[in-house]
């Protein structure tokens, strides 16, 4: 009998082991769909981004008009641009839900998979930031100025670093050119890191809602989870298309309809919604260096998750105290997101500071203590 090509061909064998014959726990829920949804987001962003790059000009005098030209004169240019801009929002929704799932179900105990995932998040954040600068609107320009300026808080080398990043003494043409180059490059780095992420995941196999070994009860990925993933794709693409068609500017900033002007500062400089939680943490500390450190810590704290796990149980499925803490953290992140969009005025300043303090307290102190307390309760 001829050998099965799917199982023996050097390339098809890899696809087979990852997407067809992959042994998968039979009880993984819809929360496990977000990995594949992120893959679809990445592919959509690369495709729409490539089409946009064909019509874009990375020059301060032409960038804004080239984006307007794409929307007005290119066949379906408006749709490609709207899909790309709103696709970024959906990408972040998916990645935040994916991280939340990993946190809830203790997936961070697969350390390599978790760490590559956090690196992926950081790379995605960098990509989104440099991409937001490209249309060269007011918020693009001032967002770039404010965020890159944060590097000047680094002692001794800060100012040199900022001028090196700008390619001059302010955000100008060299900055835009290099940001375009980076925005083109980074998604492909993300794609490469994704393969590493999956390689590490397939070393251990997927976790499951019970957090126990599922080796005795696994089913092939195809047709069960391939079908489930396709349903996920449809459910993901529906809101994306709806947003892109009916409310394309709903998540954007109206300030970005004005071309960049270094002489006029917008009344409220704020990033896109998906960075607001970190922006609120940055603003909650009155010291520049302290704010930058807190901003970095807000994401880098994820690297500590495996070391802060004190519970004898992997997931939070049967840990009501940790569940309460988890949902408090989620609510806290919503509060931070809201605070980040507000002006720096009385009620918002103290609220942001309390929310920032709560964020780090829950992650670094309360989670480990609760884990140990639940271990004690198990013995009663």
Curated annotation (Swiss-Prot):
CDD domains hit by this protein: cytochrome_b_C, Cytochrome_b_N
Protein localization: Mitochondrion inner membrane
Residue sites binding heme b b562 per the record: 84, 183
Origin: domain of life: Eukaryota
InterPro entries, A to Z: Cyt_b/b6_C (IPR005798), Cyt_b/b6_C_sf (IPR036150), Cyt_b/b6_N (IPR005797), Cytb/b6-like_sf (IPR027387), Cytochrome_b (IPR030689), Cytochrome_b_C_euk/bac (IPR048260), Cytochrome_b_N_euk/bac (IPR048259), Di-haem_cyt_TM (IPR016174)
Chain residues that bind heme b b566: 98, 197
Single annotated GO MF: metal ion binding
Ligand binding (a ubiquinone): 202
Matching Pfam families: Cytochrom_B_C, Cytochrome_B
Family recorded in the similarity comment: Belongs to the cytochrome b family.
Protein's recorded name: Cytochrome b
Species of provenance: Aphanotriccus audax
